[in-house]
């Protein structure tokens, strides 16, 4: 990691430490989630008067890497963060109530994209739910159609991965 990125890493780590969900996570997961985002410039950090207020990162995965990520959220290598065109939010940290602002900024930056995330809740840390978000210019119908296609492809890949047999 380049020297000028250490301040950035410190700002993001500070946000993690102030998040009720993230502060319980390991340094290993911090490194897996944050360093590749910085190296690949796949993040957004919001700062107000010099103080970090919100952060998110994303990876553009191919289907194979997506399956790997679903099975183990800490499994992505730095190279895999740019392996395809299936965008996933890896991290979303807004411990001071700036989540809506971060969402607005992401919608502006990526107006035509479908983005998915595994959403974790503080009381259910072992169980995540796949959610999706759409860019600001994408209509709901088109977004739903794209999401459904992604989900069908993912479901098929997961069935094949785990050798599920349909009755």
UniProtKB/Swiss-Prot annotation:
Top-level taxon in the UniProt lineage: Bacteria
EC class: transferase
Gene Ontology CC terms, in alphabetical order: cytoplasm
Record field: catalytic activity: a fatty acyl-[ACP] + L-lysyl-[protein] = N(6)-(fatty acyl)-L-lysyl-[protein] + holo-[ACP] + H(+)
EC number assigned by the record: 2.3.1.-
Any GO MF annotation of the entry: acyltransferase activity
Coiled-coil regions listed: none
Subcellular location: Cytoplasm
Keyword Glycosyltransferase: no
Any Pfam family matching the protein: HlyC
Keyword annotations: Acyltransferase, Cytolysis, Cytoplasm, Hemolysis, Transferase
Catalytic site positions: 22, 91
GO terms under biological process: killing of cells of another organism; toxin metabolic process
Main subcellular location of this protein, as a coarse class: cytoplasm
Cleavable signal peptide: none
Protein family membership: Belongs to the RTX toxin acyltransferase family.
Function of the protein: Involved in fatty acylation of the protoxin (LktA) at two internal lysine residues, thereby converting it to the active toxin.
Protein name (database record): Leukotoxin-activating lysine-acyltransferase LktC serotype T3
Organism: Mannheimia haemolytica
Taxon lineage: Bacteria, Pseudomonadati, Pseudomonadota, Gammaproteobacteria, Pasteurellales
Gene that this polypeptide is encoded by: lktC
């Amino acid at each position: 990691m380049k020297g000028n990125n250490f301040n950035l890493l410190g700002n993001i780590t500070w946000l993690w430490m102030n998040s009720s969900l993230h502060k319980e996570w390991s340094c290993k997961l911090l490194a897996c989630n944050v360093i590749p985002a910085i190296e690949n410039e796949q993040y957004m950090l919001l700062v107000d008067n010099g103080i970090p207020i919100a952060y998110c990162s994303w990876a553009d995965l191919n289907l194979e890497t997506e399956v790997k990520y679903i099975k183990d959220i800490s499994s992505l290598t730095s190279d895999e963060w740019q392996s395809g065109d299936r965008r996933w939010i890896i991290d979303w940290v807004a411990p001071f109530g700036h989540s809506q602002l971060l969402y607005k900024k992401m919608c502006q930056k990526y107006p035509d994209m479908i983005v998915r995330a595994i959403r974790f809740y503080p009381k259910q840390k072992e169980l995540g739910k796949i959610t999706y978000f759409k860019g600001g210019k994408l209509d709901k119908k088109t977004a739903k159609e794209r999401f459904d296609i992604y989900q069908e492809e993912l479901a098929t890949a997961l069935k094949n991965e785990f050798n599920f047999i349909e009755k």
